[in-house]
Amino acid sequence: KTFPMKIKYIAILILCTLAACGEKVKDTKESAPEETKVPHIVFVTGEEEYRSEESFPMLAKLAKRELGAKVTVVYSVDNHGYIDPNRTDHIEGLDALETADLMVVFMRFRNLPKKERDYITNYVESGKPIVGFRTTTHAFKYDNDSTLVEFNGAWPAKVFGQQWITHHGHFDDGKYPVTNVSIKEGQTDNPILKGFSEFEAYSWLYHVDGGDWKLQGDSEPLLMGHSTKSQHEINGKLDDFSLDNPVAWTKSYTGSSGNKARVFFTTLGHPFDFKLPVVRKIAMNGIYWALGEEDNIPENGVNVSLDEPFLPNNSGFGQKFKKNRKPAPIQ
């Protein structure tokens, strides 16, 4: 009689032990912290004037180091896989935008095929954040298809805040600065401007606001530029194109998804500007803000010290870019 009773007690003991173990495993699982999602930032470079094929890998390295982000840089390449910013009908690797948490874009007058353009427009319509530079006000140029003409002007204006209008002129590109940059009144406490100090930019001033033109949507200027050498001044056209214009702003864009995206845009972007820590700081602070990480921007701005020298070629068209280079993963 005692033997079956012992078996019964042993069975109960085993069941209790298993139940306790199961509860312990459950508790451990519930108390484990959720894995932090690493943001995927895709840098889209497709312009032939301002050497973004050099500045974007540099910014991507900073984003990887400071944010711990996964970074992808995509380029215009030729048929042999070499980086060729003069090729306007192809950017290799845009499918990376399908998994992107942020698109950082520097494009100029591209005539991409529909499949490639759709990667960009689908991303924009998703409501995910965007950071844009300079010539992205005229990212596309479609001359021979009236159904695509909206991408030449209306599309960048509604997404980024403005389309291509004019600038104050080229003067010995890269030999000396031509624009003084300062904080827009009332924006001193904006997190994107942490660590900011006034500087002189090599980027000649773009006209985006004033005269017959106005920044679109809820654009809020953060930085102002003052042109120190202006073709419009020489030509007596300052009533239309003021010497003072916004050079950086924030806005929102609500696409077909119904989700409101954060957009940071700057008309800065000359390759020599990125030699200045303050310009790299504006770019990186803007990236943090776009991702909703503004509370993690240090008081003096994001650390933008470089692990290697940044020695870009000067701005300019034609064959001024560095040759025989292929895309490579950001280390």
Question: What are these model-predicted stretches?
Answer:
Residues K1-P4:
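Short, Lys/Arg-enriched N-terminal segments with co-localized hydrophobic residues
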Residues L18-A20:
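C-terminal motif of bacterial Sec signal peptides marking the signal peptidase cleavage site
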Residues K6-I12:
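Sec-dependent signal peptide recognition
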Residues T28-E34, H40-V44, E48-A139:
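Helical hinge/lid and interdomain linker segments adjacent to catalytic or ligand-binding clefts
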Residues K64, K70, T88, E98-T99, ...:
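Catalytic beta-strand/loop cores that center a nucleophilic Ser/Cys/Thr
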Residues V105, R110-G195:
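A glycine-rich, often tryptophan-bearing local segment used as a flexible ligand/cofactor-contacting loop or short
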Residues D27-K29, P33-P39, S55, R65-A69, ...:
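Extracellular ligand-binding/catalytic regions of CAZymes and related secreted enzymes
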Residues A60, T121, L193, M284-Y288:
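Non-transmembrane alpha-helical segments in soluble domains
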